[in-house]
């Protein structure tokens, strides 16, 4: 009714369309209409009745709308989801909270750059140690050091702070045996030369030759020089009537 009153109060003019064969074929316009019908529309404006025209077109519009908008049968409802197994409990979908959003690329790089540095080399999380002894070398006590020398030291400067048994190498023993074969007693000059050649000290050369001479005498079953000299001195110092310390002559 509101639309009808609007059309009555306003000077409504029926839209003018050019004549077309489609309109005549579909009987939308009467066949007896002529081009003068469109030209004389304004003269018949006072006697135009929009209610009749609206009522005449309404059934066609409603029928077309009903024919185009005819809904089909409703789709079947989706099947319900299968129930979970008895051993598992249903879990609700986890939705990310507002505070757990991923950081921006710039914030991500700042977080990586501001990460704490790795701990020092000697710190152990299970056994924390003081900061002043973090990278300190382990203490080596005298009893932990190796006493026997099994390799030739070219940077040997001579002299030892503590007496120790020396383990000579095969090359050193071979050179000492060759020198002992030609001369069982060494002079100071020759001892220094051998010590520098074999990277040993003069004391080590002296002790080795002493031990080697004792072994040589033992192998050749020679009497000890000290015992022999002591017996000779005792025999020479006896009384004149008892030669060689024996009983007196009758």
From Swiss-Prot:
A motif (Antp-type hexapeptide) lies at residues 140-145. InterPro entries: Antp_homeobox_Deformed_sf, HD, HD_metazoa, Homeobox_antennapedia, Homeobox_Antennapedia_CS, Homeobox_CS, Homeodomain-like_sf. GO terms for biological process: anterior/posterior pattern specification; bone marrow development; definitive hemopoiesis; embryonic skeletal system morphogenesis; hematopoietic stem cell differentiation; hematopoietic stem cell proliferation; hemopoiesis; morphogenesis of an epithelial sheet. It comes from Mus musculus (Mouse). This is Homeobox protein Hox-B4. The lineage of its organism: Eukaryota, Metazoa, Chordata, Craniata, Vertebrata. The gene is Hoxb4. Residues 1-133, 219-250 are annotated as: Disordered. Belongs to the Antp homeobox family. Deformed subfamily. Gene3D superfamilies: Homeodomain-like. Keywords: Developmental protein, DNA-binding, Homeobox, Nucleus, Phosphoprotein, Transcription, Transcription regulation.
């Amino acid at each position: 009714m509101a639309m009808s009153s609007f059309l009555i109060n306003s000077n409504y003019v029926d839209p003018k369309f050019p004549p077309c064969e489609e309109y005549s074929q579909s009987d939308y316009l009467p066949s007896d209409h002529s081009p003068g019908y469109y030209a004389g529309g304004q003269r018949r404006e006072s006697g135009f009745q929009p209610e009749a025209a609206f009522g005449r077109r309404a059934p066609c519009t409603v029928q077309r709308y009903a024919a185009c908008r005819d809904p089909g049968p409703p789709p079947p409802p989706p099947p319900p989801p299968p129930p979970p197994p008895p051993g598992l409990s249903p879990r609700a979908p986890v939705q990310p909270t507002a505070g757990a959003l991923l950081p921006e690329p710039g914030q991500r790089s700042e977080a990586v750059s501001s990460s704490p540095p790795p701990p020092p080399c000697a710190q152990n999380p299970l056994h924390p140690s003081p900061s002043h002894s973090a990278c300190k070398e382990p203490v080596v006590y005298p009893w932990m050091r190796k006493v026997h020398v099994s390799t030739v030291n070219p940077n040997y400067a001579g002299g030892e702070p503590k007496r120790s048994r020396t383990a000579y190498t095969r090359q050193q023993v071979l050179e000492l045996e060759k020198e002992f074969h030609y001369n069982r007693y060494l002079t100071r000059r020759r001892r220094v030369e051998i010590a520098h050649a074999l990277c040993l000290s003069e004391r080590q050369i002296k002790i080795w030759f002493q031990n080697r001479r004792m072994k040589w005498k033992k192998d050749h079953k020679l009497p000890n020089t000290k015992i022999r000299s002591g017996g000779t001195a005792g025999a020479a110092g006896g009384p004149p009537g008892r030669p060689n310390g024996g009983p007196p002559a009758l």
